[in-house]
Structure formats: C-alpha cells, structure tokens
C-alpha cells in the first residue's frame, strides 16, 4: 500500500520491514517497524511482520494494516489455513512519533481507506470476506461496524472513486470446498501435516474482479475477468483521470480500463488534500 501526505511525501508499507517514507527528493526513511506489545502475549509481537496497506487521516495520523503477526509474506496461505484472527490495525502519529495498535484479532486485515466523514476508516478482512468500518474520532470513537459481509470472494485493497464511492479489489473467489474446510479445524490440521502446500485447498485466484461499493454496503457495479486471462488475482486498483488501473501481486502487467462517466480530472490525493481546486 502507498499514500501521499499533504507535503507530497509517499508513505509505503513494506512487508517484512514496516512503514517507510519517500520524500519528494527521493530520500527513503524508515518511519516505524514496531508497535506496542500485546499485554497478555507470550511472544513479543511488537515487531511488524507484514505491513500491508495504509491511508492518512486529515490530522496526519497514518492507519495501516498488518495482515498477520505470526507469518511472513510468503507464508500467507498458512495464515489462511489457520483461519483465525492474527492481524491488526495500527496507527502511527507523526506529531508524537509513536505507534500503537488500535484493533487486533482480525482475519488478515488488508485494504484501508479513510471514509468520507474523515473520522473513520474502511478496512478489508481478506479471510473474513468482509468490509468493516472503524471510527477513530467523533461520537462513535472506538466502534467497529460491518459494512459488507459474506462477500463472494476475498477482498484486498480499497481506494476512493471519483464519485465519492469506493473501489475494491477481489484477490480471489470463494469455493464451497474451502468454505467447508474452514468449518473443520481437524481436517485443516491433517491437510497441513500430510499434504504438500501446493496441493492444499486454495482460493480461486484465477478470476479477476473489481467492485464499486458505497458506505451503505451496496454494490454499484463490478468488472470481471472470469477466466483470469488478462488480470487474475487483482490485489490493487486506482482510479486516475478517467481510467481504472489494475495490479496484482503475481501479475507481470498493469491494466488500464476506461471508465464511462468518470471525472477525467480526478487525482485521488490532489482531491484528498484539496489541491488544484
């Protein structure tokens, strides 16, 4: 995940390293690679293992997801097989230089986007097949609500659309066999012990999908590559000047799709910070 702040610094989540900043003059700086340790954790979980996606609040606070505290980036299928909440949402405050965990026990938290009220974030739980909303300011501070649940696939990054709604990448589609396996911990344990990892039950990552949704959890439109010919396993997308750009962690290409009726002048972080208006 990447996001620009008001001063055009680019903040980047790097799996296995933490949160970094790239200044306009291309200087790379480490922002943080740790958070507060869980109070009752036997293992020291203060180090960031898999920083994933981020967005920046109006006051400069950076909210970012850590998909799992137990596994490294290449081991994400193992986290999925374990099927429990190993992830967390973390906040870095540049005013104080401190980092702390705001939510934990999440099922592979992934995409993050500041909501329209400026007081909450929308975030995806990939293995929870859901989109949730967390309030960090205002009268609902600390509350979490479900925006969309029981999605047909596994949600990844979330980004703002030019019409004020949101784009969501679906990294893969669910299957009845894997859904059943997630309700059978004994079966998953035997599979993990006896079957090579490349033969495990796995999400259908041969389908590409992006959906647009609103804050009421309504799906407004969707785009599909059902056979995964051009863009399977879409993990990120960004609307920019009337086009939707598509990327995937295992893809060797960037896709571009013309959006009918989209704002041809829309640049996400220019609008976010009120530039060129």
Predicted feature locations:
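Beta-rich catalytic cores
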Residues: 50, 85, 108-110, 127, ...
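Asp-box/WD-like beta-propeller blade repeats and closely related beta-sheet repeat scaffolds
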Residues: 13-78, 86
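Short, conserved, GDST-rich strand-edge loop motifs in beta-rich repeat architectures
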Residues: 64-84, 171-204, 256
């Amino acid at each position: 995940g990447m996001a620009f702040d008001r001063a055009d610094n680019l903040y980047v989540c790097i799996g296995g390293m933490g949160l970094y900043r790239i200044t306009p003059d291309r200087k790379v700086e480490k922002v943080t690679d740790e958070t507060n340790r869980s109070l009752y954790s036997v293992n020291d979980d203060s180090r960031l293992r898999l920083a994933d996606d981020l967005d920046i609040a109006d006051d400069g606070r950076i909210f970012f997801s850590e998909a799992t505290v137990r596994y490294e980036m290449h081991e994400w299928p193992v986290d999925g097989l374990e099927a429990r909440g190993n992830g967390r949402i973390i906040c870095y405050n540049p005013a104080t230089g401190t980092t702390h965990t705001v939510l934990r026990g999440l099922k592979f938290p992934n995409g993050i986007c500041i909501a329209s009220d400026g007081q909450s974030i929308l975030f995806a739980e990939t293995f929870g097949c859901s989109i949730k909303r967390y309030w960090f300011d205002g009268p609902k501070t600390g509350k979490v609500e479900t925006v969309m649940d029981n999605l047909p696939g596994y949600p990844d990054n979330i980004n703002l659309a030019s019409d004020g709604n949101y784009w969501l990448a679906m990294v893969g589609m669910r299957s009845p066999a894997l859904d059943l396996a997630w309700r059978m911990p004994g079966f998953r344990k035997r599979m993990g012990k006896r079957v090579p990892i490349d033969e495990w039950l796995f999400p259908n990552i041969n389908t590409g999908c992006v959906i647009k949704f609103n804050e009421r959890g309504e799906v407004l439109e969707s785009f599909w590559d059902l056979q995964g010919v051009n863009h399977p396993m879409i993990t990120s997308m960004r609307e920019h000047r009337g086009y939707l750009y598509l990327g995937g962690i295992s893809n060797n290409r960037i896709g571009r799709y013309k959006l009918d009726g989209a704002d041809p002048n829309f640049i996400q972080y220019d609008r976010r910070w009120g530039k060129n208006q």
